[in-house]
From Swiss-Prot:
It comes from the Bacteria. Belongs to the ATPase delta chain family. Disulfide bonds: none annotated. Transmembrane segments: none annotated. GO terms for molecular function: proton-transporting ATP synthase activity, rotational mechanism. It is a peripheral membrane protein. One of its GO terms (cellular component) is plasma membrane. This is ATP synthase subunit delta. F(1)F(0) ATP synthase produces ATP from ADP in the presence of a proton or sodium gradient. F-type ATPases consist of two structural domains, F(1) containing the extramembraneous catalytic core and F(0) containing the membrane proton channel, linked together by a central stalk and a peripheral stalk. During catalysis, ATP synthesis in the catalytic domain of F(1) is coupled via a rotary mechanism of the central stalk subunits to proton translocation. F-type ATPases have 2 components, F(1) - the catalytic core - and F(0) - the membrane proton channel. F(1) has five subunits: alpha(3), beta(3), gamma(1), delta(1), epsilon(1). F(0) has three main subunits: a(1), b(2) and c(10-14). The alpha and beta chains form an alternating ring which encloses part of the gamma chain. F(1) is attached to F(0) by a central stalk formed by the gamma and epsilon chains, while a peripheral stalk is formed by the delta and b chains. Gene3D superfamilies: N-terminal domain of the delta subunit of the F1F0-ATP synthase.
Length: 274
């Protein structure tokens, strides 16, 4: 979790991004997102640069000038403005600046998809790919292996997604393969799904059932959860026959487990204590 100082600095840059997005075309925002992510990659490779850009002995203007001198002509003006905003404010640690730059790039990618009207589909594609990976242990191990070159894993993911996902989804999967925010691959995918939902002002509910919910069942569940959380909920279903029946719902840290498997386990435990 970022320190308060870093969170505030990120918020300032994120607000600047929101202002930019409101007046820009989707394609321009997507280009800016790529610039931001390329600089995040640069910061990942250059620890000395990260340290210099958070050095409290330098003024914010000095740090911004340093970055502008390095990036001049290599990224677009909008990306440079966002990045100099990012480094001109205080960060608690070099790693948190890296996380902030990467998060800003992801936010820009999601905003571009939103402006293009594709964000709901991108969110679903990320979730479905995560389900495919989670259901195949060999594939999960290959894509999650930090010892394997990221480019090689990205090529594999791209082949799996070819013709099945939008380019922005593929790009976000590449970000996840890089360990977005220091997470595992599956953890990064989950976080990206949640950020996509948040961009649409929605909360994600992960639902596990023995058989797929019908349209009316899902509608009632969405209505109930939205009323509870005071925010529209988007349901992501996972089918697991082992739960036997009922439904398990996880929203953030809240877990509602009404599966038959849970009730059977509780009954077994109660009998074992007699």
């Amino acid at each position: 979790m970022q320190a308060a100082t870093s969170r505030e600095s990120y918020k300032i840059a994120a607000d600047r991004l929101d202002e930019y997005v409101r007046g820009a075309e989707s394609s321009a925002v997507a280009t800016t997102a790529e610039d931001l992510l390329s600089v995040a990659d640069l910061l990942r490779r250059e620890p000395r640069l990260r340290r210099a850009l958070v050095d409290p002995a330098r003024s914010g203007a000095d740090r911004a000038d340093l970055l502008a001198g390095i990036l001049g002509g290599k990224v677009g003006g909008d990306a440079l403005d966002l990045l100099t905003t990012l480094v001109s404010h205080r960060w608690s640690a070099p790693s948190e600046l890296l996380d902030g730059a990467e998060r800003l790039g992801v936010a820009a990618l999601l905003a571009a998809a939103d402006k293009a009207g594709d964000l709901g589909e991108v969110e679903d594609e990320l979730f479905r790919f995560g389900q495919v990976v989670a259901g195949q242990s060999t594939l999960s191990n290959v894509l999650s292996d930090p010892a394997a070159p990221a480019a090689q894993r990205a090529t594999l993911a791209g082949e799996l997604l070819a013709g099945k996902a939008r380019p922005v989804t593929v790009r976000l999967v590449e970000v996840a393969l890089g360990g977005f925010g220091g997470r595992s691959f599956v953890g990064a995918l989950t976080r990206l799904v949640e950020l996509a939902a948040d961009q649409r002002d929605r909360q994600v509910a992960y639902v596990t059932v023995a058989a797929p919910l019908g349209a009316e069942e899902e509608r009632r569940l969405v209505a109930s959860l939205s009323a509870i959380y005071g925010r529209e909920v988007t349901v992501k279903q996972s089918v697991n026959p082992e739960v036997l029946g009922g439904v398990s719902v996880q929203v953030g840290s809240d877990l509602y487990d009404g599966t038959v498997l849970r009730r059977l386990n509780e009954s077994r435990n109660a009998l074992a204590k007699r």
